[in-house]
């Protein structure tokens, strides 16, 4: 199936959560992960944000995206609070696809967590991209974790991968 959208995890994929974790999202300083501001605007497909959040709903996440000057880039924002389930649960991915109006084969999901982003996406039948340069786990740590469809070290590798997939 043809690629129609790219979905991203939030923490440590787009936003550096290692800093200021204790500060509420609405006043938290914006710290983007490397490549976000350079790469996302040049991607040729609609973008979605699929995030595990503790309390934040779509409106709070959209406010943060606006402060990060990324708000206009995201057509869809899905939070686990709104979905009523957290990644890797299939209910999260079912809700995200339905809300975005996408089929499993039409989306590419980019994340840094093997145990939530990649395992959940792969189990649900979604193509995944593991952002390995900022990952908390490796295959050496957890050999039974699902393997991603694709692996890139940083977001700077994503445009070439998208181009390859669209050829």
PLM region descriptions:
Residues 1-10, 16-17, 28-167:
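Asp-based, Mg2+/Mn2+-dependent phosphohydrolase catalytic module
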Residues 21-26:
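Conserved phosphoryl-transfer catalytic core
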